[in-house]
Amino acid sequence: MSSNDNSGIVNTCFLTTRLPAWAGVRQDEVGSDVNGLPIIPSNSMQIRSRAATTDAATEPSTRQGLNLLRSVTELNESIDELQQKMTELEKRLKIMEEKIEEIKLALANPLIENPHDGNFIV
């Protein structure tokens, strides 16, 4: 091997980020130098944004699923509550209609006993 032939020699202390892909090392990963200090690859912003995009794509799908389930449950509870209130209002309306009919009959026939106090209405 001659002194000018540098093929196959890695001239760097950043072994984890500078080795070529054919060397079987992971590329573009945060590694550490000989002293244990972190080495950030030159395209670290791309890696971070890609990782953030991946997290943003996976986390919302699970979060959205849970939020959707929670929303459906809350909506069903609200519907049940509204149905109960509607049933109660229908009962009250029926009672009021019956009372209105009684009042109409009482006004049409003045000599009918008043159901509230037992006296005759004249």
Curated annotation (Swiss-Prot):
Coiled-coil annotated spans: 72-106
Subunit composition and interactions: Homotrimer. Interacts with hexon protein; this interaction tethers the hexons together. Self-interacts with adjacent proteins. Interacts with kinesin light chain KLC1; this interaction leads to capsid disruption at the nuclear pore complex during virus entry into host cell.
One Pfam family matching this protein: Adeno_PIX
Protein name: Hexon-interlacing protein
Annotated keywords: Capsid decoration protein, Capsid protein, Coiled coil, Host nucleus, Host-virus interaction, Virion, Virus entry into host cell
Family matches, as InterPro entries: Hexon_assoc_IX
Role according to the record: Structural component of the virion that acts as a cement protein on the capsid exterior and forms triskelion structures consisting of three molecules that stabilize three hexon trimers at the center of each icosahedral facet and fixes the peripentonal hexons. Dispensable for assembly. During virus entry, recruits the anterograde motor kinesin-1 to the capsid docked at the nuclear pore complex thereby subjecting the docked capsid to a pulling force.
Gene Ontology process terms (BP): symbiont entry into host cell
Organism placement in taxonomy: Viruses, Varidnaviria, Bamfordvirae, Preplasmiviricota, Tectiliviricetes
Listed GO CC annotations: host cell nucleus; viral capsid, decoration
Family the UniProt entry places it in: Belongs to the adenoviridae hexon-interlacing protein family.
Molecular function per GO: hexon binding
HAMAP family found in the cross-reference section: ADV_CAP9 (MF_04050)
Keyword Coiled coil: yes
Main location: virion
Induction remarks: Expressed in the intermediate phase of the viral replicative cycle.
Subcellular location: Virion; Host nucleus
Record has Zinc as a keyword: no
